A protein has these predicted regions:
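Non-catalytic substrate-recognition/targeting regions of SAM-dependent transferases
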Residues: 1-3, 7-9, 14-76
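Conserved alpha-helix/loop element of class I SAM-dependent methyltransferases that forms part
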Residues: 75-90
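Conserved class I S-adenosyl-L-methionine
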Residues: 91-100
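Conserved beta-strand positions in the Rossmann-like core of class I SAM-dependent methyltransferases
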Residues: 95, 116-118
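Conserved SAM-binding loop of SAM-dependent methyltransferases across substrates and taxa
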Residues: 101-113
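S-adenosyl-L-methionine
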Residues: 118-158, 164-167
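C-terminal catalytic and target-recognition region of SAM-dependent MTase-like enzymes
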Residues: 167, 181-229
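A short glycine-rich, Lys/Arg-flanked "PGG" loop and its adjoining helix->strand segment in the class I
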Residues: 170-179
Length: 229
């Protein structure tokens, strides 16, 4: 559930499964999201029953406004949000290169970091601004609309790359990470990722991999942590 809407991924639900969800969760609507398209991660979505629209989702003491038919949100990333809140230290300068509606920017800001949140999708960016305001983080999170490669500036203690195509933009991340800083690169595949050969000399170790969730048959969402230096 995201707010009052049941959001389903993967194969199309059966009529029996839909009835079970309606009886158990009593959602205002059921959305089936086939996939997310392009860099803007626009949902390929079908409304199965009820209605959809803007909702308020509460998670880990944070507030997220969104329309799940227009922007991406994954409740399966809850543990990764918690991990960011544990890892981030007050005073850190954090870049969130694919901020979306604030999935990781809000937790980092709550942990006391100064966050530079970047998003290319105008609708997601609008919700990002709203969620910064709703969580009273205007003095910690500073948002920018556009291509993250053009918005990065200075150096950061931590860079979050929460997009499955983030490996294509590692050049930009390594240009802006401080010596000893950490890059969290999200990716999807059958097997755990590894640090690309061209970046191994820029890393202190072989990296740490976390498996987050299954996103398709034989395909998993992973996060690779890399320490620069």
């Amino acid at each position: 559930m995201i707010g009052t809407i049941a959001v389903l991924h993967g194969r199309e639900p059966t009529s029996a499964e839909i009835r079970e969800i309606e009886a158990w969760k009593k959602p205002t609507g059921i959305l089936w999201i086939r996939s997310y398209q392009g860099r803007e991660r626009i949902p390929d979505v079908r409304l199965i029953s009820g209605s959809s629209g803007e909702i308020c989702h509460h998670e880990l003491g944070m507030v997220f406004w969104l329309d799940p038919a227009q922007v991406m949100f994954s409740s399966g990333n809850r543990e990764e949000k918690q991990r960011m809140m544990r890892l981030v230290r007050p005073g850190e300068r954090v870049a969130d290169m694919f901020a979306g509606i604030g999935y990781f920017s809000i937790p980092a800001g709550m942990a006391g970091a100064t966050v530079h949140a970047m998003e290319i999708h105008p609708v997601a960016y609008r919700y990002l601004l709203r969620n910064i305001d709703e969580n009273r983080l205007e003095n910690r999170i500073f948002a920018g609309l556009g291509d993250c490669r053009e918005l990065l500036f200075g150096t950061y203690d931590r860079i979050i790359m929460g997009h499955f195509d983030s490996s294509l933009m590692l050049d930009a991340a390594f240009e802006h990470i401080r010596n000893g800083g950490t890059i969290h690169m999200h990716t999807a595949g059958r097997n755990p990722p590894f640090i690309p050969e061209e970046y191994r000399d820029a890393c202190r170790d072989a990296g740490t991999v976390r498996r987050i969730k299954k996103v398709a048959p034989h395909t998993w969402h992973y996060v690779l942590d890399m320490r620069a230096g």
